[in-house]
Amino acid sequence: MTRFYYLFFLMLSTFSPISIADERFSISAGGMLFGDLYYVSKSHLPDTTESAGWVTRRGVLTANAKAGENWFARARVEAFDEGNAEDYDLTGQGRDLYIGRKLGQHAITGGLIPTISYDVIEHHWNKRYLVRLAPDLHGVPSRDLGISLKGKISNDARVSYRLMYGSSATWEADHNAYDKFIGAVVFQPTEESLLELYVDEEPRPGNHDRSTAQVFAGRKTEQYFMGVLYTHQDRQSDPPLEVAALLGTLKVTSSASLVSQFHYLFEPSPKGNSITYLPFDPSARASNIVAGIEFSLGRQLLITPNVAWTVYDQNSQGVRPEDDLQVRLTVFFNFE
């Protein structure tokens, strides 16, 4: 794995965006890398308390292609550290591999594709390098082998739809071994504001079906972004997921912005200890905030000092788990 580590980052460090184009076909390629210098001040996991080091949360190489005005495709591979603080190990996988075609005001895409759970929200939020969205952290998948259809409902483009089927087949970044049916509608009354309504259904064997309802409302201007996200996932006999999040950015100078995500878990996260980089105690409800100051050092480098702090309610035994507190310096190189 060490050889893979050095090879990947040698490629990324020397990478610059490239493109080849003619009248009928074009291809472009780029990459990005983000990670943290971190110090764990407190943790509900005693072995990680007072640990420190560097973690590579994502290194990505991407190739995009277009043929004519309608066909498009993407191939993307990624490398990332997995494990726990002071015990990380770099691994890699394919993240995207798909082909699509525009059909007037609609588009169909098939392959290993991003789910439609987060695409609109992340486009407006645009801070995934700092922290994943709350439902993504707690188990709603972001990739699936499947097919999606997106398009406009109204002629003025203020109402649009997205439909997707995710198959039970798994490959690379898709780890969900169940069929999934997804739909969403976006209302955009102005260029700056939007409302998204989202649902999905995931049949599973026995009494373990999953169904999700999600609402997002946001507003984005040149000066700030603010958004509210609520997700409820019923898991029948399994513990449910219910989470609310507040997202925000505020530009304070031409090269500095305040950024934050706060979220509250209405129910404990059963697999919280397995969440890489930000583990949660699985026995208690929790409030988490990730907040920092983002400094832009040119078009391709962001430096963001930030804190990630989780506070717990009392669990069913009447015990409040130890807080989780990380101090981080997040670095983001973007060559895409």
Task: Kindly give the residue locations of the regions a language model identified.
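Outer membrane beta-barrel
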Residues: 22-40, 50-168, 177-179, 186-195, ...
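Positively charged n-region of N-terminal signal peptides that target proteins for export
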Residues: 1-4
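Hydrophobic helical h-region of N-terminal Sec-dependent signal peptides
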Residues: 6-10
